[in-house]
Amino acid sequence: MMVIRPVERSDVSALMQLASKTGGGLTSLPANEATLSARIERAIKTWQGELPKSEQGYVFVLEDSETGTVAGICAIEVAVGLNDPWYNYRVGTLVHASKELNVYNALPTLFLSNDHTGSSELCTLFLDPDWRKEGNGYLLSKSRFMFMAAFRDKFNDKVVAEMRGVIDEHGYSPFWQSLGKRFFSMDFSRVDFLCGTGQKAFIAELMPKHPIYTHFLSQEAQDVIGQVHPQTAPARAVLEKEGFRYRNYIDIFDGGPTLECDIDRVRAIRKSRLVEVAEGQPAQGDFPACLVANENYHHFRVVLARTDPATERLILTAAQLDALKCHAGDRVRLVRLCAEEKTA
């Protein structure tokens, strides 16, 4: 059975293995053991209440409960940009016009922005390619919403998610090549590694401070503004079905889109509810997959179960209860895994 749980110190080697499979561009999961160990420590201290809000971040892993194999990772940053500035480009417009010459040009322009400062962030989502089956990707991504719903007071009103931009298998980023490299004088893989290992001071020092007309970029770079890496397209679709939208903010390095949503408008948060759980044999039938989570802050767990999402009393097997660290009579959080498709 696949279970979501908080990260532990012993997971570091498994996270190193996952990091080696990302193919680059996942800044927050570098193949660097010291950085990953520090990330785990920060998550543990967050759960223990030892960090200020500006440093808090939760990390979860997807584990096969039978073998102990760690198949994926996901994380939530509580409030971005309160220590180090959190940069985006806002894709806007500048108009240049002359009535006398009968010229009017509305030019797409990139403006350096810190507009998402203080937002909570969904980040570090990666599922081992060998485990991309049977709803594991949905479970990994959406489990975070169950945690946010259960512990709403820990998070801010807006949630953002940076989507990985277009990068090829050799680490070539058209957006970086045409823009960032001119200011930073280093390859994309190098800047990606520096950010992932926490060395971010250079961003503020070297970033272009003035608006940039996108027409000055190569056509290849213009074409990838707000576009996602092919492997990231499913993750984008998942978030958009939960209510997230692209509001013309992009990543400063690869040009990938930043999606955002008010936390209380996220479908899985808004529609999740508490039900009593009982032990038994679940009813047979054509039921949809649902997310089921306990309400235990320090021992949080999420699993998938096929059940009636409208039930008031959820019947789970002994194995499911054990995976959730629950007992009969406890209250668990329940929501349909995917939004119901509207029928005409």
From Swiss-Prot:
Coiled coil: none annotated. InterPro entries: Acyl_CoA_acyltransferase (IPR016181), Arg_succinylTrfase_AstA/AruG (IPR007041), Arginine_N-succinylTrfase (IPR017650). SUPFAM superfamilies: Acyl-CoA N-acyltransferases (Nat). One of its GO terms (molecular function) is arginine N-succinyltransferase activity. The keyword Nuclease does not apply. The keyword Acyltransferase applies. Its EC number is 2.3.1.109. It catalyses: succinyl-CoA + L-arginine = N(2)-succinyl-L-arginine + CoA + H(+). Gene3D superfamilies: 2.40.40.20, 3.40.630.30. Belongs to the arginine N-succinyltransferase family. This is Arginine N-succinyltransferase.
